[in-house]
Design a protein with these regions (language model features):
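AMP-forming adenylation/ATP pyrophosphatase catalytic core
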Residues: 1-134
Length: 134
């Protein structure tokens, strides 16, 4: 299933809860935002100007690729990403991904995509939080 993720409207999927909101970046706040994005793997900050709506929550598609931060824009098969992160095979087909109309933006608990990463020039961020209920 493909479920839209809209600002200010929490989405419940299985044991996950997703929230999204846009925030204007205050002058000099880049280093704080960068630290926040690195500290919590269940929150993602993206440059909202680089995101191509609509934003959706869905399961990965077979053969899909992902360009995580730290790979200089290069992509890898999502199956290889899962193997490298040691995600059990039985969870892979059910694991939620956040995507725009062209690509995976973020895998909750892991990295966001390099093409939408925040930079010192970012004016507005898209903040997405994922909570995994016990």
């Amino acid at each position: 299933a493909v479920i839209p993720l809209q600002e200010g409207q929490p989405v419940h999927i299985g044991s996950w809860i997703f929230n999204a909101e846009r925030r204007i970046v205050q002058q000099g706040a880049f280093s704080d935002l960068l630290r926040l994005s690195k500290e919590d793997p269940y929150c993602c900050l993206m440059d909202s100007e680089k995101v191509l709506p609509p934003i959706t929550i869905r399961c990965a598609k077979k053969g899909e690729r992902f360009a995580p931060i730290g790979m200089n824009g290069k992509s890898q098969k999502l199956s290889d990403f899962w193997i490298n992160r040691k995600l059990p095979r039985q969870l892979r087909s059910l694991y939620p991904v956040i995507a725009d109309r062209e690509r995976i933006l973020w895998i909750p608990g892991f990295q966001s995509a390099d093409p939408c990463k925040i930079t010192p020039e970012t004016v507005e961020v898209l903040y997405i939080q994922a909570v995994l209920a016990e």
